[in-house]
């Protein structure tokens, strides 16, 4: 039996206390070796050259050089998986989402107070995300932009008919996790304003959901918003669960409505993709289309299978374009995905499959 080489980690944080805590947390795992730490990006730059780490943990707010500037330079000159350590504030959410757009693989939220003691509560998450990052494909984040698609595009004909349909009868459900903030942006960026309604679940801390919805809305012709309980689901609109709550759909006569669910975590997540997908399977059946994008773990796989069994067309993002092929891979292995699609074709295929949904 061969032992796996430990993941080599460099910790970059201006707080000596945080550097010490992260070192202790990561060093407890036999699969991780902390090869060094740095108090600012300029020191980190030299240590990266010398130590060649597999993963870097990076504080967002740093002295001497802005963390985002450092990250952008790193991804351009020496692409390395990065896990951001960010604060649970509105400003922290915006900065972290920007970091993810620049190429960071994932992030861990830093407690607002008593950081040293608070980080211990995130120990399991920190370790799992660092290990996941070591396997992530950073190059998948630097992809060419897909052409914008429209409902009457003929590049992917379905049964010889144009991609036109009554959008009030169709619903698209999407789930994502690690790498998903950018993957969802790419998909929504290439959806036309008159696309079918989209309901989405992305694993995020509660305090990040508003900033994420606003960010997606700036990049899409669709109207992207946090869902409110009981609101009608309309064509041309995309809905995310509000912070730290599940999103489900319910049937109300000839339309669907959002149901905000404050129930317990599912698959250790809240919001959970499975909660959304199972409600879509039960209430929309063959009138829906399901998709799982990049993400760690297996949340959504069983729900996507239920959607397929209910008559909905399904797809997952392919491994080559995924930052982490955990959730899509789990769904594929379960037999829940009818198609495996590169990210730059997901929007096109969702529209095509919606056109043929019964």
From Swiss-Prot:
Q: Which GO terms describe its cellular component?
A: cytoplasm
Q: CDD domains, per this entry?
A: CheB_Rec, REC_CheB-like
Reactions mediated catalytically: [protein]-L-glutamate 5-O-methyl ester + H2O = L-glutamyl-[protein] + methanol + H(+); L-glutaminyl-[protein] + H2O = L-glutamyl-[protein] + NH4(+)
Could you tell me which residue ranges the CheB-type methylesterase domain spans?
165-352
Q: Report the residues modified as 4-aspartylphosphate.
A: 59
By its UniProt entry, which Gene3D superfamilies does this protein fall under?
Answer: 3.40.50.2300, Methylesterase CheB, C-terminal domain
- Which compartment or compartments is the protein found in? Cytoplasm
Its keywords, alphabetically, are: Chemotaxis, Cytoplasm, Hydrolase, Phosphoprotein
Q: Where is the active site?
A: 177, 203, 299
Enumerate the Gene Ontology biological process terms: chemotaxis
Q: How is it modified after translation?
A: Phosphorylated by CheA. Phosphorylation of the N-terminal regulatory domain activates the methylesterase activity.
Q: Which stretches make up the Response regulatory domain? A: 8-125
What molecular functions are annotated in GO for this chain? Answer: phosphorelay response regulator activity; protein-glutamate methylesterase activity; protein-glutamine glutaminase activity
- The transmembrane segments are none
Which PANTHER family does the record associate with it? PROTEIN-GLUTAMATE METHYLESTERASE/PROTEIN-GLUTAMINE GLUTAMINASE, PROTEIN-GLUTAMATE METHYLESTERASE_PROTEIN-GLUTAMINE GLUTAMINASE
Function per UniProt: Involved in chemotaxis. Part of a chemotaxis signal transduction system that modulates chemotaxis in response to various stimuli. Catalyzes the demethylation of specific methylglutamate residues introduced into the chemoreceptors (methyl-accepting chemotaxis proteins or MCP) by CheR. Also mediates the irreversible deamidation of specific glutamine residues to glutamic acid.
The UniProt comment on domains reads: Contains a C-terminal catalytic domain, and an N-terminal region which modulates catalytic activity.
Q: Which NCBIfam families match?
A: PRK00742.1, PRK12555.1
Q: Family, per the entry?
A: Belongs to the CheB family.
- What protein am I looking at? Protein-glutamate methylesterase/protein-glutamine glutaminase 1
Species source reads: Xanthomonas euvesicatoria pv. vesicatoria (strain 85-10)
């Amino acid at each position: 039996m061969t032992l796996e080489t430990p993941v080599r980690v460099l910790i970059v944080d201006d707080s000596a206390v945080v550097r010490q805590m992260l070192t202790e947390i990561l060093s407890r795992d036999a699969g991780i070796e902390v090869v060094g730490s740095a108090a600012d990006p300029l020191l980190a730059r030299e240590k990266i050259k010398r130590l060649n780490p597999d993963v870097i943990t990076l504080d967002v707010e740093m002295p001497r050089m802005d963390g985002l500037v450092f990250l952008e330079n790193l991804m351009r000159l020496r692409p390395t998986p990065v896990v951001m350590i960010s604060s649970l504030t509105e400003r922290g959410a915006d900065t972290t989402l920007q970091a993810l757009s620049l190429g960071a693989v994932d992030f861990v939220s830093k407690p607002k107070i008593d950081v040293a003691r608070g980080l211990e509560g995130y120990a399991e998450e920190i370790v799992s995300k660092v290990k996941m990052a070591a396997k992530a494909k950073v190059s998948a984040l630097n992809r060419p932009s897909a052409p914008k698609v429209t409902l009457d595009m003929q590049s992917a004909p379905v049964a010889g008919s144009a991609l036109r349909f009554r959008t009030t009868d169709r619903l698209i459900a999407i789930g994502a996790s690690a790498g998903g903030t950018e993957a969802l942006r790419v998909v929504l960026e290439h959806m036309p304003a008159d696309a079918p309604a989209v309901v989405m679940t992305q694993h995020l801390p509660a305090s990040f959901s508003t900033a994420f919805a606003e960010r997606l809305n700036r990049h899409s012709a669709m109207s992207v918003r946090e869902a409110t309980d009981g609101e009608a689901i309309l064509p041309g609109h995309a809905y995310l669960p509000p912070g730290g709550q599940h999103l489900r759909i319910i049937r109300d006569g000839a339309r669907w409505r959002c149901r905000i669910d404050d129930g317990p975590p599912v698959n250790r997540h809240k919001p959970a993709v499975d909660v959304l997908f199972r409600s879509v399977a039960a209430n929309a059946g063959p009138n829906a289309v399901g998709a799982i994008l990049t993400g760690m773990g297996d949340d959504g796989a069983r729900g996507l299978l239920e959607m397929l069994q209910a008559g909905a067309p399904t797809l997952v993002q392919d491994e080559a374009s995924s930052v982490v092929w955990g959730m899509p891979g789990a769904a594929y292995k379960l037999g829940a995905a009818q198609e495996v699609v590169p990210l730059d074709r997901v929007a096109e295929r969702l529209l095509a499959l919606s056109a043929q949904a019964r």
